[in-house]
Amino acid sequence: MFEPNMLLAAMNNADSNNHNYNHEDNNNEGFLRDDEFDSPNTKSGSENQEGGSGNDQDPLHPNKKKRYHRHTQLQIQEMEAFFKECPHPDDKQRKQLSRELNLEPLQVKFWFQNKRTQMKNHHERHENSHLRAENEKLRNDNLRYREALANASCPNCGGPTAIGEMSFDEHQLRLENARLREEIDRISAIAAKYVGKPVSNYPLMSPPPLPPRPLELAMGNIGGEAYGNNPNDLLKSITAPTESDKPVIIDLSVAAMEELMRMVQVDEPLWKSLVLDEEEYARTFPRGIGPRPAGYRSEASRESAVVIMNHVNIVEILMDVNQWSTIFAGMVSRAMTLAVLSTGVAGNYNGALQVMSAEFQVPSPLVPTRETYFARYCKQQGDGSWAVVDISLDSLQPNPPARCRRRASGCLIQELPNGYSKVTWVEHVEVDDRGVHNLYKHMVSTGHAFGAKRWVAILDRQCERLASVMATNISSGEVGVITNQEGRRSMLKLAERMVISFCAGVSASTAHTWTTLSGTGAEDVRVMTRKSVDDPGRPPGIVLSAATSFWIPVPPKRVFDFLRDENSRNEWDILSNGGVVQEMAHIANGRDTGNCVSLLRVNSANSSQSNMLILQESCTDPTASFVIYAPVDIVAMNIVLNGGDPDYVALLPSGFAILPDGNANSGAPGGDGGSLLTVAFQILVDSVPTAKLSLGSVATVNNLIACTVERIKASMSCETA
């Protein structure tokens, strides 16, 4: 839709419509010039020229004197009355009037045309007069306000003020500086409570020479860092594009679509064994977003898969920012549509163009997120397939500089029989990843963290999950299977919210206002706190979260099976208190038996302790696995299982993210490499949001996560022995 010739055609079409719209008015002006007897200066149309309009004048006798007929008063009154009822009489009505008034049909036709022109001119003169008066009033008001600003005085000192000379940008900067001063005072007060030392002793509280990397900070070295108030946050500094930016965005998007199609369809010499040849790429695509910045590393990957979803639904997911960020919650920590330049044509997304911002994540606090500002363009190809492409727009928003640039990245979606689709995905980015922890450097550098294979694997698994939500042919023969359709949907929706909350809290995203606390001991454990108020999906009070990542020489599949199995839960779950864990109900949501949502009951060994329910979702694909769980109220779960609204069930999810380390030869003999395991807990330490957090609570949570890690390592080492 945004090819130049198509835009030009649209403009020509608009000009053509304007020409047709003014055609009758141009004709009327011609009648008015030639038939001036119908003007107000000639008794309001009381005369008419014999033979009709002046346009019918014989060209051979141009100087022949015109002959006029004056309409009678009765004729004028009758036509005036008819005009009030119907200003545009049809041919039949004109003939009837001509018979009644003893006039020619053409005389009646020309009288009505001239009358309409006369009324139009009258209305235009009246409107112009009104606009001139309004303009004059606004001009006087503007002058009065300018004089008031020029003569303004300070109420404190009586001297002149600088308001009249202050620019809008300067005024906004003053407001922002005041807000930042208040924020610094607030953070300083929090830091003083927990470290007992002046904040000035901590250099990270003052502006550093380089942008700080929160993920490399030792827990004992900083008094407080508020996530979500980072002045270097790219996404918060981005604004919607201006009108002058839009042609640039259109050109970039059209070129990116052409580049994506070639990246998808061409193999040699552009791709060699799934690796992009950078020199061949530069020769093939000399245009684009410019050369790679110094210090940035290029990542390029391509992957294909057949998924169980209609191609139209996949396009809708990609073009709806809410659906996109929900489906890819493990990759997208936050996303926003800043502007919609086109919604598409013919009732679909063909030609749709959006300007977006997004933050991409790895489920670990040791990997910085990747913020990017880009355009997303959707186009239907000639063979009926669909393509969706992203292209960075960081040249339009140079400050602060983006640490990640998306070259033409996206996917080609081809329709297959029986509701299936073939998706071919290309990821091509340039990134400054010097802040990645050494534990994850190999995984990130090989493309396993953010590459095309990760995106396709998530899409494939989520398509299976959505298919299970819509399934109606559910077998009731297996014990514990939930067959109630409404209950299944409510429980899956609750589990989806639990997974999104877990992924959002465990990564290094700056979107969430968490505060890092000092004095927790181990440097590899990240402890954060926040207050939960008026959130029906969370219990009210002070929520404490702890997360850590570590390597274990066990293949991801074995780690996943161990953690999701209720029979081995008491080997690592301290909160189960040695009780027996039993699966009460489950919903399978994929081909892999590990992809399911379960409702677990912990029968405590202590008879005085009431039984506890745990909602758990386990999901796995070749690139990542998750085991996420949360204690739930029995009464609330009964409502959910009967199809009730799950949004009001309070959840504090905890769990595990399991990623392959990317080394196929490491780990146990005969295995598939080691695992990068992230453990995260969220615990309500006080039900009063205004209560003060005790250091004892921080130490307790820190000990809990450390003990859990040791138990997992011990159990895994026993299995590998």
From Swiss-Prot:
Main location: nucleus
Endpoints of the signal sequence: none
An MF annotation (GO) of this entry: DNA binding
Gene3D superfamilies reported for this sequence: 3.30.530.20, Homeodomain-like (1.10.10.60)
CDD domains associated with the record: homeodomain (cd00086), START_ArGLABRA2_like (cd08875)
Subunit and partners: Interacts with AIL7/PLT7, ANT, BBM and AIL1.
Expressed in which tissues: Expressed in hairless cell files of the hypocotyl epidermis. Expressed in shoot apical meristem (SAM) with higher levels in L1 cells and the epidermal layer of young leaves. Expressed in primary root tips, in the L1 of apical inflorescence meristems, early flower primordia, carpel epidermis, ovule primordia, nucellus, chalaze and seed coat.
Coiled-coil parts of chain: 120-194
Null allele phenotype: The double mutant pdf2-1 hdg2-3 exhibits abnormal flowers with sepaloid petals and carpelloid stamens in association with a reduced expression of APETALA 3 (AP3) in the epidermis and internal cell layers of developing flowers.
The name this protein goes by in its record: Homeobox-leucine zipper protein HDG2
PROSITE patterns per the UniProt record, alphabetical: HOMEOBOX_1, HOMEOBOX_2, START
Keywords: Coiled coil, DNA-binding, Homeobox, Nucleus, Transcription, Transcription regulation
Compartments (UniProt record): Nucleus
